Amino acid sequence: MIGRISSKTTALFICDIQTSFLKTVTQIEELIINNKSLMDSCLEFKIPIIMTQHDKNLFGEIVEPLRYSSSSSSSLSNVMVFDKIAYSMYTKELAQYVKENLPNLKSVILTGLESHVCVLQTALDLLENGYEVHVIDDATTSVQPKEYKSSLKRMKQSGVFLTSTETVIYQILQSDNHPKFKKIDELIVKRLFQINNINK
């Protein structure tokens, strides 16, 4: 298992990036930018996107920038949102959806909050069900930095691939000859510009 990613057998799972975390998570702006870039790129690649919101009465709705992806000309029909109470995204409802609609799914790009709770438990469930899991380390975090670092180690011990936003996008792109190269390059430049602005 070396962690190759193909747009034909991959989905993006975005876990619980909800409004209640806006004031409690450090560097939340960068995390949202990275997730938005991944979302826009996956729409261009026609990679399915599955999002969850955990107990939205308590944690609020998905943050505004991730509720849509206006920079992409691709159809938003590729985006599904599930409500959940369990920590793991991989609920019976979601598992059934994947079985019926994504029969070729082999690998999952996983992001979101919090890394040591919902993201970790999602990763373990996906691994247990035979999927390769690629956790994007700059698109997930926890309120407590110590828990974030610990969770990455824990997931790696179980066989999760740890990677970054830009790395995984280029891994899918593979070549400048890809028909989506120009659009993806624009999205990458846009992301870097936005991150540089918030870090000034």
Swiss-Prot record:
Family stated for the protein in its record: Belongs to the isochorismatase family.
Name of the protein in its database record: Isochorismatase family protein 2A
SUPFAM superfamilies: Isochorismatase-like hydrolases
Pfam family, one: Isochorismatase
Annotated InterPro entries: Isochorismatase-like_dom, Isochorismatase-like_sf, Isochorismatase_domain
Highest rank taxon of the organism: Eukaryota
